[in-house]
Amino acid sequence: MNKEQKIIDVWMQHPNLDFINHDMFASLRRWMGIDKVTEEIPVEITVSAMDEGQVQKGLICAWWGPGGELISNDEVAASIKRFPDRFVGIGSVNRYKPMDAVREVKRCVNKL
């Protein structure tokens, strides 16, 4: 890769405890020999991994799945505030509640 090429990760999450301890990641935790993660992972760990992979920017995503919110829009906004030159945010909403979703999109655009 030459120095003029830029790497952008277009789908990333910075895991919080709800996300990493969710049942969908149970096999990953078993494979890693981890029963349950009990301490928050600092966002600096994600930035460090980006540095190691020569990723200049990441589109960091909130996550609202069928079981509810796992990574909030506010958490994504906090990561962007800490590292504005490294992250661009992608919000998430509860698609099963369309009016709440519209209000949340407006909140994200106007306040976050």
Task: Describe every region a protein language model picked out.
Residues 1-112:
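Helix-coil boundary/capping segments in enzymes
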